[in-house]
Amino acid sequence: MYSNFQSKVVFIAVALSVVFTATKIKAEQYPKGPITMVVPWKPGGGTDRTARLFAPYLSKALGVPVKVINMGGGGGWVAWSKMAKWDPKKDDHTIGWVNFPHMLSYLNPKMKNKNNLDSFNFLTGHSIDPCTWLVREGDKRFQTLPEFIAYVKAHPNKITISVGGFGSDDHQAVAFAEKFIPGFKVKKIFGNNDAKKLQELYGKTADAVGGNISYFVPHMLEGKLRPLAVLGKQRSNQLPTVPTFEEASGVKNYNFAARVLVAAPGLPDEKGKVLTAAIQKAMDTPEYGIRELRGHNTLWKVDGTKLKDFLTALAATVGKVKFWDLPK
């Protein structure tokens, strides 16, 4: 009887060993083929540039080719709607980029978008680019943020700020100021890329621009632009002498463009860990880091609970501002 029991124990142990080994081998074989990386914008934008620069390094880390495809439209939602429905089996070799705070436009009830943060499988953050407000160097009306705010209050709806699209990080930064700084009312020019913003500023169609640090640093070095503030929790390493919005005004106006990589919802944890580890390994490649530094793009390696908590807090802030209800 003892012998039979002992035989069963041995059999179970062997069976479990076989299952464990098979699972391990299967995990080690992932990915089995090329990875598709989806950019939710048309070719030529910042995320597209980053994706194409990053792809060869991720390919090396994974040991398989990485193909970048563009799926623009709907302010990112043509692609994001598909990402939220990716099948963990059929789409296990597909990853995509999600941009914040742009993706949080789902909070706008007018969009009737049923997706939310829980609709996505976030792997890891990749890069973060704080916003900044800039004016023309030498503008006698204002050269500091307190001067700018005071002038706006004294001249409501007379100052024009050029920003990106409606609901973009640039727009939300201005909307936050309108919501929480009494008397701060400005006109806005929407839908401009950064080059167009500068044309409007230099041509005096706009009095100020809202954008991301990475694009404007080279123009600041030319001595044509005066940064009023950085809209981050800390000062930027690229602009160490420029105060944060909070330092200069006492208002906690934090806004930025952040890029996060996602995989199919429900993807097995072991596969998600392989992808996350490879992405972060590629980000740590010295050559890649230098190339992003030259482009003034700040890498942002955060995952798991910290990433989810960060995004949840951001969604709460956007929900309080309700930029969609403010005057355009």
Regions of interest found by a model, annotated:
Residues V14-F20:
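Hydrophobic core
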Residues A27-S119, K158, F166, K179-G210, ...:
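N-terminal (or domain-start) structured segment
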